[in-house]
Amino acid sequence: MSESLHLTRNGPILEITLDRPKANAIDAKTSFAMGEAFLNFRDDPELRVAIITGGGEKFFSAGWDLKAAAEGEAPDADFGSGGFAGLTEIFDLDKPVIAAVNGYAFGGGFELALAADFIVCAENASFALPEAKLGIVPDSGGVLRLPKLLPPAIVNEMVMTGRRMSAEEALRWGVVNRVVSQSELMDSARELAQQLVNSAPLAIAALKEIYRATSEMPVEEGYRYIRSGVLKHYPSVLHSEDALEGPQAFAEKRDPVWKGR
């Protein structure tokens, strides 16, 4: 594993810290290492939730490493099968990822956060997609994911001028889930991770699968699709041991013991 990444396992929770001073910028080598970490997380049955954060208190990530670019790394370089930062193009990850944004999330750093399922950020965090000012475009998910969260007027200003969005503004628009102090950031992310662990893993997988498949469908079409039998996790949930365990635990006034089957 790359020296730029620190991995910590806390039971079913994996913490990934990107540590590349000064700005946690990401070159192709680092992107490959991040992709390996996320794919291992996907494939490890003992892991349930991942938290991605940046080292230090100033930068979550400044995105693409412009020093590497100046040395010849092309904008369309191979960043690995998971896409830039290892997560932006993993489309079969049925476990939740939390971005704990500890500071500036610019360019590909913002796109990394957008690829997560939840964003918890520090009060000093801010978000921007300044690629147009560098002669490129935010094509690692920024131009695809941000329009699903914000009105066109806001998106256009952010992607065409590089305007920054503060943590509080991001919270108002629903781009982030929580804004906390820097000192509370990781505790808040871990609290959310534990809440996710408390939910049934098959149910979480089915929810992510349904979101991916039906997010652009009319409601009626979505109903037909999820009942058509083509989904992997949804039918499994309905006939799982966990589907029996949940109501049984509720009736017995105890915490459920999920088996993931």
Swiss-Prot record:
The species this protein was found in: Salmonella enteritidis PT4 (strain P125109)
Catalytic activity, reaction form: (R)-carnitinyl-CoA = crotonobetainyl-CoA + H2O
Gene3D superfamilies linked to this entry: 2-enoyl-CoA Hydratase, Chain A, domain 1 (3.90.226.10), Lyase 2-enoyl-coa Hydratase, Chain A, domain 2 (1.10.12.10)
Listed name of the protein: Carnitinyl-CoA dehydratase
Entry GO MF terms: hydro-lyase activity; L-carnitine CoA-transferase activity
Active site annotation, chain numbering: 111 (nucleophile), 131 (proton acceptor)
SUPFAM superfamilies: ClpP/crotonase (SSF52096)
Top enzyme category: lyase
Family: Belongs to the enoyl-CoA hydratase/isomerase family.
Keywords: Lyase
GO BP annotation list: carnitine metabolic process; fatty acid beta-oxidation
Pfam families listed in its UniProt record: ECH_1 (PF00378)
Purpose: Catalyzes the reversible dehydration of L-carnitinyl-CoA to crotonobetainyl-CoA.
Gene that this sequence comes from: caiD
Pathway(s) served: Amine and polyamine metabolism; carnitine metabolism
